[in-house]
Amino acid sequence: MPRQFSTIQKCAFGFAALFLGVYLLDYVPGIMDANGLMFGLFQMTSIVDLGHLGAGTLAVIGALISARAARVYFWVLGVWYLIDVVTYFAGHLHKIPLTKNILVNMPHILIFIAAFWIASTVSLPGSETSSNKEA
């Protein structure tokens, strides 16, 4: 019988696809401009690449282990990206225009909000969004 994954585990697989996809985009011709910026906005370095690869790999591991491990992944991811947004935003407050600062941070803002929302609401035992019991 095939293994059944809870909704939060499926979300973790989705985040794995997102992060591993961003990692792989670095190696697609035409995505990076002459200044090394992805889509002309996002500076991608080896450290950033490793961060995306690590976040995607940890998402797969959390999803495969259990719903509880996937939930821990989302809490840690939310905290990590919240710290990232605050430090980047504050560090670049007087270096780049406010609008560009917000736009550059928008993917990470959406990720930490989604991660906290998933960790706090998806697949909780006894909730309406729970499709399987948490392991």
Task: Please place each PLM-identified region on the residue numbering.
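Membrane-interface extramembranous regions
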Residues: 1-135
